[in-house]
């Protein structure tokens, strides 16, 4: 098993963790129903880009 020779510095630790930040979900408002939904996904009513695509 590999064992480190020296303790990594706070700077190196921070550089390694720089890509670990969480991002918020991008929400859009539907043109027809005014409902919030994820980008490139249909709403719960079945609308996508203002058109009815699924009968629910």
UniProtKB/Swiss-Prot annotation:
Pfam families hit by this protein: Ribosomal_L32p
Disordered, as annotated region: 1-21
Spans traversing the lipid bilayer: none
A molecular function GO annotation: structural constituent of ribosome
InterPro entries with a match to the protein in the record: Ribosomal_bL32, Ribosomal_bL32_bact, Ribosomal_zn-bd
Alphabetical UniProt keywords: Ribonucleoprotein, Ribosomal protein
Compositionally biased tracts (Basic residues): 7-16
Assigned GO CC terms: large ribosomal subunit
Domain of life: Bacteria
GO biological process, one term: translation
Family per record: Belongs to the bacterial ribosomal protein bL32 family.
Protein name, UniProt field: Large ribosomal subunit protein bL32
């Amino acid at each position: 098993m590999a064992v480190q020779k020296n303790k990594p510095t706070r700077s190196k630790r921070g550089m390694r963790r720089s890509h670990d930040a969480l991002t918020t979900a991008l929400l859009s408002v539907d043109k027809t129903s005014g409902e919030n939904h994820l980008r490139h996904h249909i709403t719960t009513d079945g609308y996508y880009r203002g058109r009815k695509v699924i009968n629910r």
